[in-house]
Amino acid sequence: QCHNCFYLPRGGKSADLSTRVFNKKKKVYYNSGIHFVACSKWLGNSARQSSLLTGLQLSVIPNPIDTHVFCPKDKRVARLHSTLPEDKRIILFVSQRVTMERKGMAYFIKAISLLAEHYPEMKENTVIAILGGRADEVVSQLALPSFPLGYVKNERQLVDIYNSADVFVIPSLDENLPNTIMESMACGVPSVGFK
């Protein structure tokens, strides 16, 4: 049941706007025959367990990834196209805006710091590629050499960047089934993230 919403001014009340909206949605949903679609099993299971959608029709249909485009390519060629170093291990981080707290950059920075501390040779043989807005704002906080790539809209460039990476890291605090994981895996790049 949705009530007493902490997002509302003064913390909400027992019969605040969130309660009224919840009750209205429940009435509309149950009387309309809507069939809901979730893009991941986790999101589908969460929706099925919610008090708003319990008992309603719901299917899971993952977002499509074109595996003719997002597929393994020659790493050396991909690195030439992406201008990333040919002779280093590459850890890839991707986010629309890398400074968004929920995307987990603070955890990524800490993890890279620990890796560099325990494996000092990484400073010579490993680099970070950061794809997304505000990437240049975090470079100085990373203990390994970093390449802020900014936004990339060109699909071929994006595929080259994924194929350049040795590992894709997604330390987000909340995601359902992000395309970045699917694209990375389709390119044959292992993904590491929180459960």
Question: What are these model-derived regions, one by one?
Answer:
Residues S14-V60, I65-V69, K75:
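A short, active-site helix/loop in glycosyltransferases that binds the activated sugar's phosphate group
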Residues D74-I90:
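Nucleotide-sugar donor-binding and catalytic loop/hinge architecture
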Residues P85-K103, I109-S113:
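Conserved donor-binding/catalytic core segment of Leloir-type glycosyltransferases
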Residues K123-N125, G132-V159, V167:
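Nucleotide-activated donor-binding/catalytic signature segment of Leloir-type glycosyltransferases, i.e.
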Residues V159, P178, M182-A186:
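Short alpha-helical segment that forms part of, or immediately flanks, the ligand-binding pocket
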Residues D166, G188:
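A short alpha->beta transition loop at the rim of the catalytic pocket in nucleotide-sugar-dependent
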Residues L173:
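Aromatic "clamp/platform" in nucleotide-sugar-dependent glycosyltransferases that forms part
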Residues P190-G193:
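Short hydrophobic beta-strand element within catalytic cores of glycosyltransferases
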